[in-house]
Amino acid sequence: MKVILRKDISTLGDAGEVVDVKNGYANNYLIPQGIALRATEGTLKALETERKQQARKIEQQRIAAREVADKVQQLNLKVLAKAGESGKLFGTVTSGDIAEALSNEGVSVDRRKISLESPIKTLGAYEVGVKLFMDVSATLKITVEAES
């Protein structure tokens, strides 16, 4: 019996694939558990339209991410932090601080998408990676300055 998988199963395949399984396995386990659907003409057409919609949605998200990446690339962000005379910060500049400074500039980025190799603990200029989508990333230039 041909079924369409709704979830990834290591022994059968990935979600959305059409696989051939034994009738008993499909009728007694996969279909009642909601893991698979019978592969009829209607479900195959529905699957195809769903894939097209998903592809369109992903492309729209990719375009939006590229626009944000262009904005991020052009920014030279200033982050103010309390620091001692030696240039060492009292505390650290984290991805949350950077996300907040970005939102003040009008660019909304989730703090989890900002990748710091380690928290910033001294004054100076830094480059930080921002992964906005699967294959869209940008480099943000940050200058950490002392609060006056």
UniProtKB/Swiss-Prot annotation:
One of its GO terms (cellular component) is ribonucleoprotein complex. GO terms for biological process: translation. Pfam families: Ribosomal_L9_C, Ribosomal_L9_N. GO terms for molecular function: rRNA binding; structural constituent of ribosome. SUPFAM superfamilies: L9 N-domain-like (SSF55658), Ribosomal protein L9 C-domain (SSF55653). InterPro entries: Ribosomal_bL9, Ribosomal_bL9/RNase_H1_N, Ribosomal_bL9_bac/chp, Ribosomal_bL9_C, Ribosomal_bL9_C_sf, Ribosomal_bL9_N, Ribosomal_bL9_N_sf. Keywords: Ribonucleoprotein, Ribosomal protein, RNA-binding, rRNA-binding. It comes from the Bacteria. Belongs to the bacterial ribosomal protein bL9 family. Binds to the 23S rRNA. This is Large ribosomal subunit protein bL9. It comes from Chlorobium phaeobacteroides (strain BS1).
